[in-house]
Curated annotation (Swiss-Prot):
InterPro entries: UppP. It is a multi-pass membrane protein. The chain crosses the membrane at residues 1-21, 41-61, 69-89, 96-116, 172-192, 207-227, 233-253. One of its GO terms (cellular component) is plasma membrane. This is Undecaprenyl-diphosphatase. It is an enzyme of class 3 (hydrolase). It comes from Wolinella succinogenes (strain ATCC 29543 / DSM 1740 / CCUG 13145 / JCM 31913 / LMG 7466 / NCTC 11488 / FDC 602W). It is found in: Cell inner membrane.
């Protein structure tokens, strides 16, 4: 992988990792368009740029994260379903990975967002701060996050949907989703890096480093912009976007 490809994929990862649109789907499509070889190193590269995106959330929310143990306890509770199911079903989840799965998950997730916004258009949300989230809500959101083990579902998408159903307002649902990414993705990416460490070499460290830094920068931009957007608008544009992207996926990859 050359530096140009590393920059492009870093931008795509950073912009999409925390939006409810499936970063996996975007990385697959862009890699196909650029003709990037889907080898073992490519998998390791994707894991490393995910790590860059995660660190952006740590940087942006550092004050809240270090304000007390309560938030960490809630994140730990929310992580339990994904941690347990991920450990038990790791091989089965990896076997689900296919472009067709991603495409259909994108479309279905888009429909869910549209239906949810229609049903909740006049709803008064009962939880208007991350601090007001209870442990039961945290655990329930954790089960929604487990759905993201299906490729294309989007981790942020599934947790935001869960938050909205449980009564979190849009911004709080997004913020808790971002915070929950920290334990979830640190552990998942750490394990995957360990499993794929044999693909690392001196020759490809520059691409890894560039992609990591680019993903970090663009993830910070995306998270800030997304929170501003969702404070004023709803998730309908993301639902429509997911459906369109899923259809493009199906046509481009000759799945229909």
């Amino acid at each position: 992988m050359d530096i140009f490809h590393a920059i492009i994929l870093g931008i795509v990862e950073g912009l999409t990792e925390f939006l409810p649109v499936s970063s996996t789907g975007h990385l697959i499509l862009v890699s196909e368009l650029l003709g990037i070889k889907q080898d073992d190193f490519h998998k390791t590269f994707e894991i490393s740029i995910q790590l860059g995106s995660i660190l952006a959330v740590l940087a942006l929310f550092r004050e809240r994260l270090f304000s007390g143990v309560d938030i960490w306890l809630k994140l730990a509770v929310a992580f339990i379903p994904t941690g347990a199911l991920g450990f038990l079903l790791y091989k089965h989840v990896k076997a689900l990975f296919a472009p067709s799965t991603v495409a259909y998950a994108l479309i279905l997730g888009g429909i869910v967002f549209l239906v949810l916004e229609w049903l909740h258009k006049d709803k008064e949300y009962k939880i208007n701060s991350v601090e007001s989230i209870g442990y039961k809500e945290a655990l329930a959101i954790g089960f929604f996050q487990a759905l993201a083990m299906i490729p294309g579902t989007s981790r942020s998408g599934s947790t935001i949907v869960g938050g909205l159903i449980l009564g979190l307002n849009r911004k709080v649902a997004a913020e808790f989703s971002f915070l929950l990414a920290l334990p979830t993705m640190f552990i998942a990416t750490g394990y995957d890096l360990y499993k794929n460490s044999h693909t690392l070499s001196i020759e490809n460290l520059s691409a890894l480093g560039v992609g990591f830094v680019v993903a970090f920068i663009f993830a910070m931009i995306a998270v800030k912009g997304f929170l501003k957007f969702i404070s004023r608008f709803n998730f309908v544009p993301f639902g429509i976007y997911r459906i369109i992207l899923g259809i493009i996926f199906l046509f481009y990859l000759d799945l229909i």
